[in-house]
Amino acid sequence: SSRTVLSNISNIQRRPQVVGKIKKEDGVALEEKAPLNKGLGRMVSQSNLISDVQLKTTKIIPAYQDIADVEVPINAMINSFTELEVDDIDLEDLGNPTLCAEYLKDIYKYMNKLERRLEPSDYMAHQAEINFKMRSILVDWLIQVQSRFNLLQETLYLTIYIIDRYLSKQNVKRAELQLEGVTAMLIASKYEEMYAPEIGDFVYITDNAYSKEKIRQMEQKMLKTCEYDFSNPLCLHFLRRNSKAGAVDAQKHTLAKYLMELTLVEYEFITKLPSEIAAAALYLALKLIDDSNWTPTLAHYSGYTEDEILSTVSKLSILTLSMDNSKYQAVKNKYSASKFLRISLIPQLKGHILSKFAERN
């Protein structure tokens, strides 16, 4: 293709049977709701809509026992949490093999260690040909591709993580940045999706800028660079746990998801741990909706006290307030849809509470 790569990241459809308006923003051309005429459209089901988990308001907690200790009297467990002023949010799930309540303490302890071990580094200083703006353009476009392909939220978060981890270890040419982005989404799709898009779908969405062979070669390179390890915890994993601990409703949970997704586009947040971003997003959502408190139960399960996340909350508030003037509108447009409760359009996102937190920075 003679197209200048990245300066015009494009997925312009050239097939005559595809219809839909073309929208260009900051060099990115994207169709609005024009279906792909490949196998992807048939394979993706309604179950892949980004609906997230069903929120429960039951009281549960990561058990402090190994499996051999499950038979400890329930009253003893309740007493231990009463002393800590922490609700046992897992009590009702004990004995349910599909929920693994007996193992949750160890699972989240391991996830906290893992997010630190696999954390991407601050890599932009050693990149000669790319910069913050190019990364933001790429991520903003990938968010639109994720919506277009109807991929899971986990796939999107893992895609951005793979990009940042790869860039932490490799210098990338400007002309290959979009290639790296679609290859990361291909890898993430194979890892997360029941039916992953085909390589041809990514060739198509990039307007044939890269061949199938180029994508395969980049896939091999990225897999080796990342040592075939994509087991890092995602913000979503921690948010779901926190939402359960806070017994939050769908509006607060969706607002926290929106705030978290805004951070994907901003390079400033790549050195923040997923657990911290999840805690800060839920904290801000609680304050914006009804000024709910950050309870001892939330502090216990998130691993963060109110004081420990206020700095990140402030940065997140500044980012949210900047959205009206931002060139990168993919997340805001995505969450203006009815299936996301039009959460990006609520008046609280322009109110004095958000401004108050932003001023603390």
UniProtKB/Swiss-Prot annotation:
UniProt family annotation: Belongs to the cyclin family. Cyclin AB subfamily.
Record's protein name: G2/mitotic-specific cyclin-B
Its biological purpose: Essential for the control of the cell cycle at the G2/M (mitosis) transition. Interacts with the CDC2 protein kinase to form MPF. G2/M cyclins accumulate steadily during G2 and are abruptly destroyed at mitosis.
Listed GO biological process terms: cell division
Taxonomy, superkingdom: Eukaryota
Keywords, in A-Z order: Cell cycle, Cell division, Cyclin, Mitosis
